[in-house]
Amino acid sequence: MLELRHRGSCPGPREAVSPPHREGEAAGGDHETESTSDKETDIDDRYGDLDSRTDSDIPEIPPSSDRTPEILKKALSGLSSRWKNWWIRGILTLTMISLFFLIIYMGSFMLMLLVLGIQVKCFHEIITIGYRVYHSYDLPWFRTLSWYFLLCVNYFFYGETVADYFATFVQREEQLQFLIRYHRFISFALYLAGFCMFVLSLVKKHYRLQFYMFAWTHVTLLITVTQSHLVIQNLFEGMIWFLVPISSVICNDITAYLFGFFFGRTPLIKLSPKKTWEGFIGGFFSTVVFGFIAAYVLSKYQYFVCPVEYRSDVNSFVTECEPSELFQLQTYSLPPFLKAVLRQERVSLYPFQIHSIALSTFASLIGPFGGFFASGFKRAFKIKDFANTIPGHGGIMDRFDCQYLMATFVHVYITSFIRGPNPSKVLQQLLVLQPEQQLNIYKTLKTHLIEKGILQPTLKV
């Protein structure tokens, strides 16, 4: 897609470079001239946009207007641009953190809605960039199909979530049972309808560009929808698996900015000239310490550590359970060098605090590469930010570019090292079986438990 350029600078049908003559060809032959002309026409018809385009050929996107509130502009008018940006970023950061705490207080369902809203906004910002770059081509149905595919993919992923975590609710609603039973077929049929609409929308002079934008939409869906689905999966494991990773990325973003602002001297990467080694290293140590402390505080409360479950009897999400071993204090022997520093041989920790070190390390060492990736994308399209939704910060995608990598890592980490069989899910699957199947499973399980010595055999009189 980066090789396309604005329609106004594209060569006309007869401006394509002619193929070189073979040795021995008669330069003035009528037959050869006609053959060459036909070949050129055929090449031009099929390949109107040659692969010789460079990134500099991409039309520039007009800069977004400044959306900083007038009250802030007046209050900070006497400051230099550097300190003005500092105060704007700081005030908006504190505001967003306060709103985040409020949503946490409102419960897991509101957090899910927040994730869904952020996903839609990030998708909108990325798709809008493609539309603004190539809007002069007047591509048919591009925006309509993009949003249609977003709807289809969300229907597929969140339908899977409903089937997994809302089984008791679905069993009471006959209409929902049909949708869940044939969910994957319905999802596939919806996607096929969009696929056929795309094929029908193809226009001869825009074939290549339309396929570029088709790929653009699907990659955007992969980045936004898939990752947001994983975030919600992490949330169902317990709110702590949602809060510690996300807050670690936020902490790293803030502390790396602070260390870089005050102490930054050595550039870190060319993609982001303002990033420095001082900020990167300072952010790493700050994030590990923050994650360790946050894990200790949150591990004390059932509200944060219990898996999120939907209870049909109260028609709401509940976070009540007996905390697992991860969230129960354990005594550990310290290694020799720590014994000398702390002057004690043992320490009591929650096992989750040890896992938090791995999460914080990823957030501070690998997570920033999501931001570097986004910086490269923005440089390719000559834009400063994805949007101007948040003054001083850019778009929503500018704030969540690192979170998507983190979501995938946490999901892989949980499935690889933490998650075991879920009794609740097993029970839900048993409840939808036929009575004969349930009875057979009961007899098999009873026999197994008797052989293990857990149950006593029933005496026949």
Swiss-Prot record:
It is an enzyme of class 2 (transferase). Its EC number is 2.7.7.41. It catalyses: a 1,2-diacyl-sn-glycero-3-phosphate + CTP + H(+) = a CDP-1,2-diacyl-sn-glycerol + diphosphate; 1-octadecanoyl-2-(5Z,8Z,11Z,14Z-eicosatetraenoyl)-sn-glycero-3-phosphate + CTP + H(+) = 1-octadecanoyl-2-(5Z,8Z,11Z,14Z-eicosatetraenoyl)-sn-glycero-3-cytidine-5'-diphosphate + diphosphate; 1-octadecanoyl-2-(9Z,12Z-octadecadienoyl)-sn-glycero-3-phosphate + CTP + H(+) = 1-octadecanoyl-2-(9Z,12Z-octadecadienoyl)-sn-glycero-3-cytidine-5'-diphosphate + diphosphate; 1-hexadecanoyl-2-(5Z,8Z,11Z,14Z-eicosatetraenoyl)-sn-glycero-3-phosphate + CTP + H(+) = 1-hexadecanoyl-2-(5Z,8Z,11Z,14Z-eicosatetraenoyl)-sn-glycero-3-cytidine-5'-diphosphate + diphosphate. The modification Phosphoserine is found at S35, S37. InterPro entries: PC_trans, PC_Trfase_euk. Changing K204T: In a breast cancer sample; somatic mutation. It is a multi-pass membrane protein. Its cofactor is Mg(2+). Homodimer. Interacts with FOS; this interaction may enhance catalytic activity. Catalyzes the conversion of phosphatidic acid (PA) to CDP-diacylglycerol (CDP-DAG), an essential intermediate in the synthesis of phosphatidylglycerol, cardiolipin and phosphatidylinositol. Exhibits almost no acyl chain preference for PA, showing no discrimination for the sn-1/sn-2 acyl chain composition of PAs. Plays an important role in regulating the growth of lipid droplets which are storage organelles at the center of lipid and energy homeostasis. Positively regulates the differentiation and development of adipocytes. This is Phosphatidate cytidylyltransferase 1. It comes from Homo sapiens (Human). The gene is CDS1.
